[in-house]
C-alpha cells in the first residue's frame, strides 16, 4: 500500500466509524504514472530553491593562486614520475588572459619538475613574465635506488633553487605510489629518513614545501552504497586506496606530522586543507601543534562549504596560515572541480566573499565529488587580503 492508498483507506474508515457501516466505495484514483528506474549518471536534479545569487566577476582583492598545475611529467609509471621532461597544459598568453579577468596577480605552478625540465618551465613562464608565475621543483624519484640518493636529492634542491624554483612540491606519490624499487616492492613511507636531507635543504633555503599526503577519507573506505563519493570513485576506480597494502588515512597524516616535527625550520603547506577537510578539528589540532604548518584550500571548497559555520571559525582563527589555491589545471575538463577557467574562480570568490546559499562547488551538471551544495562564509576584508595574497606572498618572499 502506497501513501496515497493509505490516506484514502484512512478517510474511508474514519467515515465508517462516524456514520456506521457504508457500502460506498473509495473515490476512484486517476492513473498515476510510476517513475521508471534510471541510471544514476542520468539523474541531474535542478533545485527549485529561490535564493540570492551573487555575480562574482573578480576577486575583491588581488590574489595569488598558490596551487596550480601548468605542467606535468612527460613520463610516469604507476604514479611515479620517471623523467624530467615536461608537458605543458597552457601557454602563458592563455593563462594571463584569465588572470587579468579574474584579478589573479600570480600563479604558482607546483609541478615544475626537476633538472632540465624545471629550468625550461622557469624560463617559459617565470622569467618570461616576471612576478606573474612562480615554479616549484619536485623530487627526482628516478634516482631513488641509488645508494647516495639522500645526498643527491639534497643537492638537487640546491640546484633547483639556483635555477629559480620557489618551493618544493610533494605529490601523494610519496606514501601511496613510490616503492623501494621505484615502481615495485614495499611502499616507501612519508617519514623515511632518506628524505631528511631534502627537508633540511628546503628549510635552509627558505623554500616552502607544498605537501600532498592522503586523499579524501572516502577514498579509504569501500566503494559501496554507503560511500558518499561513490560516483566519483566509480568514474575513477584508481583513486581508491581501500585495501591492498595501502596505509590508512590516519597513518599517512601521522607520518607527515612526524616529518614536520623533525624539521621545525622548514615551512610545510599541507595542501587540500591538510588533506582532512572533512575533519577541521583534526586540522586545527595540527596547526596548533606545528607552527611551521600552513594549509591551502585547493579542491576542497566542496567540503568547507557544506560546514560554513565551522569553516568561518576556522578561517578566523587561522587567518595567517591559510592560502588561496584551486588545484587548477588548464584544459582539465575531466575534473570540473579543478578546471582552469573563469567559472571555477567565480565559485571560489562566491564561497569566500558572500553569504550565498546552496550553490554548486564546481562548474558541472553533476557535482563531481559528492551530491551536495555549499554555502558562502562571507569573510572580512582583513581575512580576505591575507588568504588571497598576503600569506602566500610571505611564504614566497615576494
Q: What is each residue range found by the language model?
A:
Residues 35-47, 118-239:
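Active-site gating/metal-coordination segments in enzymes
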Residues 67, 99, 202, 295, ...:
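Conserved, mostly hydrophobic/aromatic
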